[in-house]
Amino acid sequence: VSLGSVVTIGDPREIDDNDVFDRCIQTLAPWRKGPFRLFGRPINSEWRSDLKWERIRSNVDLRGRSVLDVGCGNGYYGWRMLEAGASSVTGIDSSLLFVLQHALFAQYIGNQQAILPIRLNDFSVQEPYDVVFSMGVLYHQRNPAAHLDALSKLLTPNGTLVLETLISPTKLAPDQRYARMKHVQIPSIEDLYRDLEALGFNDVDVKNVSLTRTTEQRSTANMPFESLAEALSGQNALETIEGHRSPVRAVIIAS
């Protein structure tokens, strides 16, 4: 088992029926987050999630801390959080497919990371978390301020919020689509500072701002559908097909 940049389970020499895992990987497609390797079989996900994690991991200390990952997907980041020293990781995501993808690996790694198939609005806890992550979730919310408020209430008094989101120079809420996505609201950095400080976060710091490139989000054998390239203008890769600025993402740490 390796929880490094490619989350890896097993060696192909350990198994007799090589087709079983090929069928599992194919049945559970599309794979959005990764990369993984399962008994020698690479799972090449749409997102190079290892690149995002590189932008985050040096900016937050997870050693001995309890972690909640909201909108966790298939748990790729949760395994990386455990590698970084988290004492426990709980993920929530409403997609049953992602929960099943996680289960495929968890049966070999162990139950160090739990993923619950529920939405944030339905999630309640007895013990708050030291660190709460929300990555790639905020701009999909109909009420982004309420999302931030809900996250803040899941933290210990000295807890840390890790927010990763699309950003725009000014708030962007297209009537139609943005990069083919419906119902998005993309905040500005100023919006995020204001909303987080209003919730009582005294230390809000932008740690990274990055243009999302087609080397990081793309179609693969394990996610064969259209991806970022098809959402960008054929004449100008710095614009979406709708004429908006192409995706730029920020990492914000608030405490």
Features from the language model and the residues they span:
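Conserved SAM-binding loop of SAM-dependent methyltransferases across substrates and taxa
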Residues: 74-85
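A short SAM/SAH-binding and catalytic strip from SAM-dependent methyltransferases
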Residues: 130-144
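A short glycine-rich, Lys/Arg-flanked "PGG" loop and its adjoining helix->strand segment in the class I
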Residues: 145-160
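Short alpha-helix
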Residues: 184-200
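Short, glycine-/aromatic-enriched active-site segment of Class I SAM-dependent methyltransferases
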Residues: 165-183
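Conserved SAM-binding strand-loop segment of SAM-dependent methyltransferases
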Residues: 110-122
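Conserved class I S-adenosyl-L-methionine
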Residues: 65-73
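N-terminal accessory regions of S-adenosyl-L-methionine
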Residues: 1-50, 107, 178, 193, ...
